[in-house]
Each structure stands twice: as structure tokens, then as C-alpha cells.
């Protein structure tokens, strides 16, 4: 082999492989390869993925310190117009070069002034070429509706529309026979809930649906009814003083739910029969929160229902994996008639902060008979006398007789949890860390079958980590002799491995 001569090894690769490699580059980078040789120009014309992002083109460069005031603003506007025109010409040129070759993905991200007429032409062009993955992320002023042909595509498999301040969806006919994934972000529907229903009715094999930051608090109703749906992200634009009127779900084959919304006035239908994993962030309005605070101050929390989310909570009771935000804990306390039985639940994650108490946590644990892993994202919670026996702010700890009675039953003593994880334990060693250590000890004293405690301590101070580790490891009063400790920090990971914990050799 002659190593003295340079060889163009890459150009010798098969054209199909080169096109595949180019498809991973953004379109500006891929287009730059066309100047290498005539072969590369033809290769670029066959690239199946096009990714246009005006932020890549609209870079103004460094500011000239000699130019300021109105002259600088004028220069910026002129330069911005030039770059915008350059971007539009580039997109036109690429689409013209590719002509009618097959197209897999077309992604368009726009944050600046681009001619809407040209945008529509680009969309129609790629639809004519049979694009299967269309992503439009546009933040610009566009008063009309999106092109109706988007919703009459025989080839689209994935569609993502994020058009903040942009066009709205107004469809009379929807025919998307191959669409499996639909993302709708910050989009306005001309006919509100009716418009959404119309859109979904034309997606006969849809499996994944993302509805994010849509103002359905202003709608008469919002409904998702799809028997083919498997994954749903339902994220409302939560308003401080508004609640949705009516929300319903008929999704019997759904297995994954990500839910963020204010409590609706009613949940007329909730069908999550196949649900396996749910992330729930359900929130009260400001007025509802104020009502709960007033009830607490008056000592009248019992029976105080400021809203009713019972039907929604009942609908998720079949899950195996459940993530609850701190606001959802509050909803379970003040907006749920009773906590249902979570018979299938094996993994529960609870978020906590100083503004919300643990009143509902005790009921959750009592009604989760098969729970194996319990995760707390933070241990700090609002001090109250209504946390029950979950924590150390329980009112009966001041009663010496009950404190001395080791047989006092607690929700923890019947808790089947084997793995306890504490995330965001703290950052610096102070009095608050001591309180959290006491809370962890309380868990260890009461949970009978715990086999592993994993604690994440967000500190770079190794001495503090060792101090916490030793306190927990040497704690003598532990319900389970099988429990192993692992403490993870920024720099360290300490583990008792196979050795028995807390003074047991």
C-alpha cells in the first residue's frame, strides 16, 4: 500500500451510507459538503432529512464599539433583514436542488421575521414530496390558520406543531391515516374543544399524543378519546385564577400518562384501564389554596373540600409506577373524597417542599399494599399537626406515655417498602440536616421490611457526608437487620455493601 499518496477514503464509501451520515448533520452543515466535488452535490440532493433553524443563520456577530445609539439600532435592523433574506433564499435553494426526491423528515425552526407566504410554500412542497416526519417550531406573528393540507396527509407518521404567537388550527376535514405521533404545543384551536376532537377523530392509529400549554381553561370542555393511544402528555396552561370546566379521557389502552393541569370542575369520563406509569402534577387555583389556608387556621380541615378531583385520582389507581408533585399531595388532602386503593403500585415518588404538609402521605402508604420502592424528592414539608404518624411533627410525640409505647401502630409499621430513596437530602450540614437525619431514622425505626436505604446528599463537603453516613450506620434502633445503606454525594459514594447495618457485624 502506498502511504505516500493521500486518499479520499470517505468519498469511496457507498452513496447510501454517505447520505445516511449527512442526514445526521443540520442542513447548513450538510449543504456545505456540496462544494467538495460534483458527487457530493448529488449526494446532498438525496439527503432524506432537512433541518432548518434560522438561529443558525441569524447571527449578528460582534458589536462594533464605534457604533452606538440610533445608528446601532439601524445597523442591527438592516443586518437582521439581510440575514433573514439569506435564510429564506437558502431554504428555497435547498428545496429547489432536491426537487422531488423522497423526503423523510422536514424540521423548520423560526424565531425571526420570515415571509409567511414562503413558509406556506415550503410546507406544501415537502407535503407533496411525501414527508413522513414534519416538525414546525415557529414563534412569529401569523394571524391566519395553518395550511389545511397538513391535516390531509397520506404519508405523515409524526407531526409536531409548536406555533406560539403563530397560526391557529381550524380544520373541517382531517385525514391522517398513518400518523402515530402528534405533538401540539402552544397552539390555538379556532373551535376550542370541538376543534381538538375534530383533529383527533382523523388520527385512526395514533399512539402518542402531546398536548402542551394550551389554554383549555377558557374552553367549555376538553376531551381525549382514542382507543389506540398508548402515551399521553397532557399539560395545560395553568392559570392562577382559572380552572378547566370539563375534562374527560377515554383512553382504555393508555400505558403512560404525564399530567399537569389545574383541577377541573368535573371529570365526566376517566378511562385509564391499562395505565402502568403516571406522573401527576395537579394544582389548585389561588382562590382554592386560600380557602385551604383559611380552613387550616380555623382548625376545620376535616371535611373541607375546595374542589373535587376524586374521579381523576380513582382513574389512575391501576398504575404500577406513580410520581406525585408537591401540589398533588395538597390536592389529595383538600380535593379528594378518599384516597383509593393502589393495589398494583410498586414504585411511588413523592415531591416535597416547605409549603405543603404530608397529610395525605399516610393514606397513600396505607392504601399501597404492594409498594416496593418509595422515593422522596426532598424531606422538608410544612409543619402541621395533621401529618399523622408519617413524620416527627406528629402531635402524639409529646405524649410521654405513647412515646414510650413501642407498640404504637403507625402507617409505616405496615408499609411493605423494601427500597427507600431520599433525593435532594440537603446541601450544607446545619440544624435542618439534623432534623432530616432524625426523619430518616424515624423511617428506619418503623418500616419493617426495608432492605436498602439510598440517600443523595447534594454537598461537595466530604466530611459532612461521612458524618451523616456514620450517624445512620450506627443508629441502633432499626426495624430491619437486613437494611443496607448507600450515601451518594458530589464526590463520594459510601455503601455498607453486604455488611449488616447499624452496629450489626
UniProtKB/Swiss-Prot annotation:
Residues 7-55 form the F-box domain. SUPFAM superfamilies: F-box domain (SSF81383), RNI-like (SSF52047). Pfam families: F-box, LRR_At5g56370. InterPro entries: F-box-like_dom_sf (IPR036047), F-box_AtFBL13-like (IPR053781), F-box_dom (IPR001810), FBD (IPR006566), FBL60-like (IPR055294), LRR_dom_sf (IPR032675), LRR_FXL15/At3g58940/PEG3-like (IPR055411). The lineage of its organism: Eukaryota, Viridiplantae, Streptophyta, Embryophyta, Tracheophyta. PANTHER family: RNI-LIKE SUPERFAMILY PROTEIN. This is Putative F-box protein At1g58310. It comes from the Eukaryota. It comes from Arabidopsis thaliana.
